[in-house]
Amino acid sequence: MNKWYTEDYEFTIEVIGVSGGGKTEGHCRNGDEVGDIYKCGYDCPVNQRGRGFCSKSMLLLFPMLETVRGGGDLRMIGGFSPSGNVPDSPLVKEFVCPDGVVTYRLTAKKTGGENFHTGGFYRE
């Protein structure tokens, strides 16, 4: 792989809650535990143990990543804060996995890189 472009955002996805008494066995197929942290740019998120992000939850996450990359505000796409503890920021959002088991907090951080499309990197 030749990653030649520096992404304009980096993303952190933290596991902040797991239903079922916090135990993943019998609940979370991916094995997510409170405190697990996934990171990514444009690639798929990977946690501190090198394990990939839940494929079902990725269906929810990807549109949020694109919202940020497109200059959008995560507060404007609806939802709520399951923990009731989200900073008032356009770059932070909590969401629950499709199975209703794991609660994640997405945080985006601007890297200083230019947008892939408006920065002149994309070529047809």
Task: List the model feature ranges, each with a label.
Residues 2-19:
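Short, basic/aromatic beta-hairpin or loop at an interaction surface
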Residues 10-14, 39, 103-105:
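Beta-strand secondary-structure signal
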Residues 72-124:
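Short, compact, well-ordered microdomains
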Residues 26-48:
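Short, flexible N-terminal segments of the mature chain
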Residues 5-7, 34, 98:
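Solvent-exposed loop and beta-edge segments used for protein-protein assembly and interaction
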Residues 20-26:
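Short N-terminal binding/cap micro-motifs at the start of the first secondary-structure element
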Residues 17-19, 46, 110-112:
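Beta-strand elements of well-folded, non-transmembrane domains
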Residues 49-72:
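Short, compositionally biased
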